């Protein structure tokens, strides 16, 4: 029987499936951070259980670390306790930890792929909703809750029901300057923020194959924002070239054997999907969200929509509420909306290609008066590479703040946050009410679009910035 990539990955990992019961899956990699793991380790301790497979468990600090100092005390009491607990737990249970002073420390979904922890064909879990990022490698990756974190630590398995399948095909080639972030925002604009609920999405089509691994990670990272359980891109030469030579990747003949298997990780011809969505890449322009969920998104050259234009009464009410929170009036051009802060970072857009794209806009320009702009690399290696390329100097000369790695202003869990009423052009993944700080107003954009907003003081079409 013809199978989708998701079905192949799922079936390959079933340990046990009793009749009328949820299948038990083997988990190849477990990524751990300081926020969702303390109670899980406490549970192990209470029952006298070890970590079943410490060699398949990798920990880092990211959510509530300071991006201005490596001092563990810098982000408050709760952050300090969580980080100290992670240090204690990893030491006690034999788990490798990339702590604040480790050169590989960074956002968990940047660190995993970068170190070759993430490989095609794997099942990967983390106590974090954006674990879908790793699906860019053709791995089945999804977020789990703290009780499930404990279950995986104890057994290296997890009960998981089968999801529905969804194919999203982006046909043709994207125009110059259009990024994976624009593509995925356009997709969510079409499906809505619940369009993928109950599904595992496979992205395909020429525009997807054209993306680098970093672009594919951005794409899969945001699949959760349309309600999907996980996202996949079938592995190809782009994937194999990225993985080759990384710290935890197979070496020599083992790598060649792995690639031979990875090449089988494709959806079979004739396999059927429960849902199919198609977009034309050439129709996608730079995207900016205007509301309080990622599906409330328009082209940078559009006007803020009028809630009355939505036929669905639920959408209309949602739009009215969103505009009131965002402090926007219907009908005004988006390019006239001024911003207070800019955040370039997060597990969506903090990799080296993202920073290069932002630096290209920032070079030779200055951050607009009254705007605070942060650039937060996703990991120690990203920061080191950016500095080797001189990107830090470009940003600093333009008036951006060059920070240490961490989740930073993506979520109000550390010192980087918005004040009430402040408007931010952000490369992160969620524009919910209060996500970046109580009363903060978040607009999601690509790194180049964020840099353009920083230097102009408002949203601007990067295609018009010479």
Curated annotation (Swiss-Prot):
Keyword NAD found: no
Cofactor: [4Fe-4S] cluster
Catalytic reactions on record: (2R,3S)-3-isopropylmalate = (2S)-2-isopropylmalate
Keyword Secreted in record: no
Residues given in the record as [4Fe-4S] cluster binding sites: 347, 407, 410
Pathway(s) it belongs to: Amino-acid biosynthesis; L-leucine biosynthesis; L-leucine from 3-methyl-2-oxobutanoate: step 2/4
InterPro entries hit by this protein: 3-IsopropMal_deHydase_lsu, Acnase/IPM_dHydase_lsu_aba_1/3, Acoase/IPM_deHydtase_lsu_aba, Aconitase_4Fe-4S_BS, Aconitase_4Fe-4S_dom, IPM_dehydratase_rel_enz, IPMI_cat
Superkingdom of this protein's organism: Bacteria
Keywords on record: 4Fe-4S, Amino-acid biosynthesis, Branched-chain amino acid biosynthesis, Iron, Iron-sulfur, Leucine biosynthesis, Lyase, Metal-binding
GO biological process, one term: L-leucine biosynthetic process
Pfam family, one: Aconitase
Co-factor remark: Binds 1 [4Fe-4S] cluster per subunit.
Record GO terms (molecular function): 3-isopropylmalate dehydratase activity; 4 iron, 4 sulfur cluster binding; metal ion binding
E.C. numbers: 4.2.1.33
Cystine pairings recorded for this chain: none
Biological role: Catalyzes the isomerization between 2-isopropylmalate and 3-isopropylmalate, via the formation of 2-isopropylmaleate.
Record's subunit section: Heterodimer of LeuC and LeuD.
UniProt cross-references to PANTHER family, sorted A to Z: 3-ISOPROPYLMALATE DEHYDRATASE, HOMOACONITASE, MITOCHONDRIAL-RELATED
UniProt xrefs under NCBIfam families: leuC, PRK05478.1, PRK12466.1
Family label: Belongs to the aconitase/IPM isomerase family. LeuC type 1 subfamily.
Protein name in UniProt: 3-isopropylmalate dehydratase large subunit
Annotated source species: Shigella flexneri
């Amino acid at each position: 029987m013809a199978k989708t990539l998701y079905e192949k990955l799922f079936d390959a990992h079933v340990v046990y499936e009793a009749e009328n019961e949820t299948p038990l899956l083997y988990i190849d990699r477990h990524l751990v951070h300081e926020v969702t793991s303390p109670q899980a380790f406490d549970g192990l301790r209470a029952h006298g259980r070890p970590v079943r497979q410490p060699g398949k468990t990798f920990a880092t600090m990211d959510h509530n670390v300071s991006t201005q100092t490596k001092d563990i005390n810098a982000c408050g009491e709760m952050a300090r306790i969580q980080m100290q607990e992670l240090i204690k737990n990893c030491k006690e249970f034999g788990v490798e930890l990339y702590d604040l002073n480790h050169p590989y420390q960074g956002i968990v979904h940047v660190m995993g792929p970068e170190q070759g922890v993430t490989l095609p064909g794997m099942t990967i879990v983390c106590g974090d909703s954006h674990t879908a990022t790793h699906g860019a490698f053709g791995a089945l990756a999804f977020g789990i809750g703290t009780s499930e974190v404990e279950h995986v630590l104890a057994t290296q398995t997890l009960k998981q029901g089968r999801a529905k399948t969804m194919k999203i095909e982006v046909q043709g080639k994207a125009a110059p300057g259009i990024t994976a972030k624009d593509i995925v925002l356009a997709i969510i604009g079409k499906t809505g923020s619940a369009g993928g609920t109950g599904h595992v999405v496979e992205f395909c089509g020429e525009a997807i194959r054209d993306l680098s691994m970093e672009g594919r990670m951005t794409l899969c990272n945001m699949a959760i924002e349309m309600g999907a359980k996980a996202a996949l891109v079938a592995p190809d030469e782009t994937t194999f070239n990225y993985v080759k030579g990384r710290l935890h990747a197979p070496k020599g003949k083992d790598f060649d054997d792995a690639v031979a298997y990875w090449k089988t990780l494709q959806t079979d011809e004739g396999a059927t999907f429960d849902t199919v969505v198609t977009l034309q890449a050439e129709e996608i322009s730079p995207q900016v969200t205007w509301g309080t969920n990622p599906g409330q998104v328009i082209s940078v050259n559009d006007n803020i929509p009028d809630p009355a234009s939505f036929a669905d009464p639920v959408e209309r009410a949602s739009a009215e509420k969103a505009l009131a929170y965002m402090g926007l009036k219907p009908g005004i051009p988006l390019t006239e909306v001024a911003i207070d802060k800019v955040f370039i970072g997060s597990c969506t857009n903090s990799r080296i290609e993202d920073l290069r794209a932002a630096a290209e806009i920032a070079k030779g320009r200055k951050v607009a008066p009254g705007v605070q702009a942060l650039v937060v690399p996703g990991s120690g290696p990203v920061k080191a590479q950016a500095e080797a390329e001189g990107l830090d100097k470009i940003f600093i000369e333009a008036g951006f703040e060059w920070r240490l790695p961490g989740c930073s202003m993506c979520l109000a869990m550390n010192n980087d946050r918005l004040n009430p009423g402040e408007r931010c052009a952000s490369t992160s993944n969620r524009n919910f009410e209060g996500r970046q700080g109580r009363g903060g107003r978040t607009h999601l954009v690509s790194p180049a679009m964020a840099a353009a907003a920083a230097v102009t003081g408002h949203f601007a079409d990067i295609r018009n910035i010479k």
